[in-house]
From Swiss-Prot:
UniProt biased composition (Acidic residues): 225-236
Biased composition (Polar residues): 163-184
Cellular-component GO terms for this entry: cell projection; centriole; centrosome; cytoplasm
Family statement drawn from the similarity comment of this UniProt entry: Belongs to the CEP43 family.
Regions of compositional bias (Low complexity) in chain numbering: 185-196, 266-282
UniProt-listed Pfam families: FOP_dimer (PF09398)
Ranges of compositional bias, category Basic and acidic residues: 239-255
LisH domain location: 70-102
Record protein name field: Centrosomal protein 43
Length: 379
């Protein structure tokens, strides 16, 4: 019965499988599952090929560096640093990645190779720290004295018995300088000679030009000596005498320079010969000319007397040229008083200017013949 029961179960399983396959095929699920399985198989095969052909993880530059003695020494120092501080996880990554699981030297061998003597100061730290300290000491060596340049190796100049350095170097420098100067002087002798000739010719041209200039200046100075005489003559520096003093009509006291009165305020001189319009010409005989002039003088003196100017026939003509009047006696009066007198005189002149316009004239009277021999129009 057991066998029959097993056969019945097998038949039922087969029927169930067939029914399941048929159902999955009808629904399309079985075909999709087959396609996915097929794709997964292909992908697995392709990835397997890539993994087989993949290059190994090897750092070529690091491999070359570690093949040298210094490279292995550096790697040993780093490994010793990690071992000293018990950095096991970092060391577990460092050794496989650098392929230094074997062959790195220990602390004692490193100290011997680097020349480091194990002492109390070095035991308290890794060897890498001691290497850095020694490098810093070498850098500071020239200033601290270690590794500095030995100045005794440099040969100093010999010293005299008194302890002073001799000056043998300075003569050699002087000799070199003299040799250089001689060479330059020889090389520059030819251009200097040419330049000197050019300068001499140029100087001669300039000298001739200057001599011509000086001769021309002397000729010009000789051609116009009158101008120099006129400039140097003191006669032209003297002030022009005032009309009243020269003509003898009215004499006033000498005015100080800078006084308020000026020649512009003096009465105008008009129609100097208005009263002598009917006089005969000067080419007539002396008797006729003297008679007419005397008549005119008498007429002028009469008019002046009628105006009260104080000049009559009895006045001496010499006093007019000496510029003496009733104010000449006050020459020692102060400047302030003279200014006041000048102002008063100017006021009087303004009042009498209209009366003197027709009487202004210039007469030169001969004291011997009492006859005017020269007449001049002042206007």
């Amino acid at each position: 019965m057991a066998a029959t029961a097993a056969a019945v179960v097998a038949e039922e399983d087969t029927e169930l499988r067939d029914l399941l396959v048929q159902t999955l095929e009808n629904s399309g699920v079985l075909n999709r599952i087959k396609a996915e399985l097929r794709a997964a198989v292909f992908l697995a095969l392709e990835e397997q090929e890539k993994v087989e052909n993949k290059t190994p993880l090897v750092n070529e530059s690091l491999k070359k560096f570690l093949n040298t003695k210094d490279g292995r020494l550096v790697a040993s120092l780093v490994a010793e640093f990690l071992q000293f501080f018990n950095l096991d996880f970092t060391l577990a990554v460092f050794q496989p990645e650098t392929s230094t699981l074997q062959g790195l030297e220990g602390r004692e061998n490193l100290a011997r190779d680097l020349g480091i003597i194990e002492a109390e100061g070095t035991v308290g730290g890794p060897l890498l720290l001691e290497v850095i300290r020694r490098c810093q000491q070498k850098e500071k060596g020239p200033t601290t004295g270690e590794g500095a340049l030995d100045l005794s190796d440099v040969h100093p100049p010999p010293k005299s018995p008194e302890g002073k350095t001799s000056a043998q170097t300075t003569p050699s420098k002087k000799a070199n300088n003299e040799a250089n100067q001689s060479d330059t002087s020889v090389s520059l002798s030819e251009p200097k000679s040419k330049s000197s000739l050019h300068l001499l010719s140029h100087e001669t041209k300039i000298g001739s030009f200057l001599s011509n200039k000086t001769l021309d200046g002397k000729d010009k100075a000789g051609l116009c000596p009158d101008e120099d005489d006129m400039e140097g003559d003191s006669f032209f520096d003297d002030p022009i005498p005032k009309p009243e003093k020269t003509y003898g009509l009215r004499s006033e006291p000498r005015k100080q320079p800078g006084s308020l009165a000026s020649l512009s305020d003096a009465p105008p001189l008009k129609s100097g010969l208005s009263s002598l319009a009917g006089a005969p010409s000067l080419k007539d005989s002396e008797s006729k000319r003297g008679n007419t002039v005397l008549k005119d003088l008498k007429l002028i003196s009469g008019k002046i007397g009628s105006l009260g100017l104080g000049t009559g026939e009895d006045d001496d003509y010499v006093d007019d040229f000496n510029s003496t009047s009733h104010r000449s006696e006050k020459s020692e009066i102060s400047i302030g008083e003279e200014i006041e007198e000048d102002l008063s005189v100017e006021i009087d002149d303004i009042n009498t200017s209209d009366k003197l316009d027709d009487l202004t004239q210039d007469l030169t009277v001969s004291q011997l013949s009492d006859v005017a021999d020269y007449l001049e129009d002042v206007a």
